[in-house]
């Protein structure tokens, strides 16, 4: 028997390629009715949404979802485990925080979630095909970007409020001028500093 929508979670990550800060994951359970309503409101992959549209969707998702949760893995965990394992850890943490028993997890992408012991299915481009995955993407993106922007005043000079940790030219120049912070992913910066100087 196929699992009901109320027991299916969509999970997605954001910030995988960033140089700074944690990788985030969202996990969302939606009824079929909630999925249709959110899609009608413009729900899609968070990367395709403007900041304003994404912010408008967040409370709609939180209200419509049967359950939702977030997880993260720190820059230190990324350096210790590698980005794939750390990303999976953030997804597992999000899924474990859901109060709803799950019969199936839909994972965005082509790689299965190795740490998840229950049934799962990968969905290529799931954040543009599956409402629950798209909703997870939006919640995770909004939460991560909000955190990084709040940290911008603490780590002044890196332009975090503009690039939220991604590897832009502004970020690269700041790293070369100021060096990495405690929240930078050192494993991501090896090539940059191999060319331009030591990683201190």
Curated annotation (Swiss-Prot):
CDD domains linked: RNase_HII_bacteria_HII_like
Keywords: Cytoplasm, Endonuclease, Hydrolase, Manganese, Metal-binding, Nuclease
Enzyme class: hydrolase
Enzyme Commission number, as recorded: 3.1.26.4
Catalytic activity from the UniProt record: Endonucleolytic cleavage to 5'-phosphomonoester
Cofactor: Mn(2+); Mg(2+)
Cofactor binding: number and manner: Manganese or magnesium. Binds 1 divalent metal ion per monomer in the absence of substrate. May bind a second metal ion after substrate binding.
Record-annotated RNase H type-2 domain positions: 6-200
A Pfam family: RNase_HII
Protein name: Ribonuclease HII
Function as written in the Swiss-Prot or TrEMBL entry: Endonuclease that specifically degrades the RNA of RNA-DNA hybrids.
Annotated source species: Prochlorococcus marinus (strain MIT 9303)
GO molecular function: manganese ion binding; RNA binding; RNA-DNA hybrid ribonuclease activity
Cross-referenced PANTHER family: RIBONUCLEASE H2 SUBUNIT A, RIBONUCLEASE HII
Binding site for a divalent metal cation: 12-13, 108
HAMAP family the record matches: RNase_HII_B
GO biological process, one term: DNA replication, removal of RNA primer
Compartments where located: Cytoplasm
Keyword Transferase listed: no
SUPFAM superfamilies reported in the protein's UniProt record: Ribonuclease H-like
GO cellular component, one term: cytoplasm
Homology family: Belongs to the RNase HII family.
């Amino acid at each position: 028997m196929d699992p009901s929508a109320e027991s299916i979670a969509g999970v997605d990550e954001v910030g995988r390629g960033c140089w700074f800060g944690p990788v985030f994951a969202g996990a969302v359970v939606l009824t079929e009715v909630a999925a249709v309503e959110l899609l009608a409101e413009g729900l899609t992959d968070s990367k395709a949404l403007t900041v304003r549209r994404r912010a408008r969707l967040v409370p709609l998702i939180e209200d419509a979802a049967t359950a939702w949760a977030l997880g993260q893995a720190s820059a230190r965990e990324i350096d210790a485990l590698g980005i794939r394992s750390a990303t999976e850890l953030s997804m597992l943490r999000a899924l474990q925080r859901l109060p709803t028993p799950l019969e199936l997890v839909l994972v965005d992408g082509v790689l299965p979630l190795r740490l998840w012991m229950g049934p799962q299915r990968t969905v290529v481009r799931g954040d543009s095909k599956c409402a629950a995955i798209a909703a997870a993407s939006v919640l995770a993106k909004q939460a991560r970007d909000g955190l990084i922007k709040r940290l911008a005043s603490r780590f002044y000079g890196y332009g975090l409020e503009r690039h939220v940790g991604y590897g832009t030219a502004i970020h690269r120049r700041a790293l070369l001028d100021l060096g990495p912070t405690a929240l930078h992913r050192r494993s991501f910066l090896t090539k940059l500093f191999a060319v331009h100087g030591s990683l201190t």
